[in-house]
From Swiss-Prot:
NCBIfam families: PRK14128.1-1 (NF010726), PRK14128.1-3 (NF010728)
Principal subcellular localisation of the protein: cytoplasm
Function recorded in the entry: Inhibits RpoS proteolysis by regulating RssB activity, thereby increasing the stability of the sigma stress factor RpoS during oxidative stress. Its effect on RpoS stability is due to its interaction with RssB, which probably blocks the interaction of RssB with RpoS, and the consequent delivery of the RssB-RpoS complex to the ClpXP protein degradation pathway.
GO BP annotation list: cellular response to oxidative stress; DNA damage response
Species the sequence originates in: Escherichia coli O6:H1 (strain CFT073 / ATCC 700928 / UPEC)
Subcellular location: Cytoplasm
Record's protein name: Anti-adapter protein IraD
Record's keyword terms, sorted: Cytoplasm, Stress response
InterPro entries per the UniProt record, alphabetical: Anti-adapt_IraD, IraD/Gp25-like
Gene Ontology cellular component list: cytoplasm
A single GO molecular function term of this UniProt record: anti-sigma factor antagonist activity
Family, similarity comment: Belongs to the GpW/Gp25 family. IraD subfamily.
Keyword Cytoplasm belongs to the record: yes
Quaternary context: Interacts with RssB.
Name of the coding gene: iraD
Length: 127
């Protein structure tokens, strides 16, 4: 299996540079989830057919999903220093996740929320 690598130049953490780093990470994460050719495992990107066949309230399944997603995202996004993946909602046709992360060269946490609805991922605003 061939792995893709991403080379990233990290900006200094001053003013607009930090904001553009945060925007860039969010944009790249959304693109990673939205791309039909994403290097993320298929269940993590468009896995609702597989998700529907399981008990969505199964805590072991939810924990496995979060661990797999965390591992894949840390591998594909080198600007993330720390990451926590939380399942906010898990229903048959809808899945809501929250990514809470710390970026290198940024002192503030960043939250990125996604919802799987009607066959695709959508960004939501954190509450």
């Amino acid at each position: 299996m061939m792995r893709q690598s991403v080379q990233t130049v990290l900006p200094e953490s001053t003013g607009n540079n930090t904001l553009s780093l945060r925007d860039s990470v969010c944009r790249d994460l959304f693109q990673l989830f939205s791309s039909p050719h994403s290097p993320l495992p298929i269940l993590l990107v468009s896995g609702m057919p597989e998700w529907q066949g399981h008990n969505q309230s199964d805590k072991l399944l939810q924990s496995w999903y979060c661990r797999q997603l965390r591992s894949a995202l840390l591998f594909h996004e080198p600007r993330i220093a720390a990451l926590q993946v939380n399942l906010k909602e898990a229903y048959c046709h809808e899945l809501a996740i929250s990514l809470e992360m710390m970026l290198y060269h940024d002192d503030e946490p960043l939250t990125f929320d996604l919802v799987w609805q009607k066959g695709s991922w959508h960004r939501t605003m954190p509450q």
